[in-house]
Amino acid sequence: MSTLRGFRSVFCDASFFVALFSKKDAEHKRALELFKEIKAEKISLCTSWFIISEAITVLLYKYGYTEASVFGESIHLYQAVHSKETQYHQALALFNLYGKDRTISFVDALSHVLITGVLKNIPAISFDEDFRSLGLTTIS
């Protein structure tokens, strides 16, 4: 059964990229399955430069330079959405609203702002529960 059939684009979280580019990650197998569907369905991959930064840093420190470097060489495959100052302020407000009670990062808050705004609520691929708790359509 196809999880992604019918979608033209998806937003990729750092947790998806980390799982996809590290064979040691607990979600690696699932990330590969999703990536095969993405290729088969010709789905566009959207993300943000904040996500790319987070993913390459986690890959480097958790799994090593090779994984981080291979991911870095792939960034031309993704449509990186550029953020505006007003979106940073919206993300900070969301972070301040939820950050005290849960472990929501600023990057997750900014992703929410981008997905619900300029990206018109496209689904997100994430193994991070924060996306689901923020009310985003999340595939994992």
Residue positions per predicted region:
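Short active-site oxyanion
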Residues: 40-45, 77-79, 119-122
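Active-site neighborhoods of divalent-metal-dependent phosphate/nucleic-acid chemistry enzymes
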Residues: 80-123
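Conserved N-terminal glycine/acidic-rich loop preference
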Residues: 74, 79-88, 103, 131-140
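Histidine- and aromatic-rich ligand-binding microenvironments
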Residues: 10-13, 47-48, 104-106, 128, ...
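Acidic, PIN/NYN-like endoribonuclease modules and their adjacent C-terminal/linker elements
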Residues: 1-9, 112-113, 118-140
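Short, well-structured N-terminal submotif of metal-dependent ribonuclease cores
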Residues: 1-46, 60-70
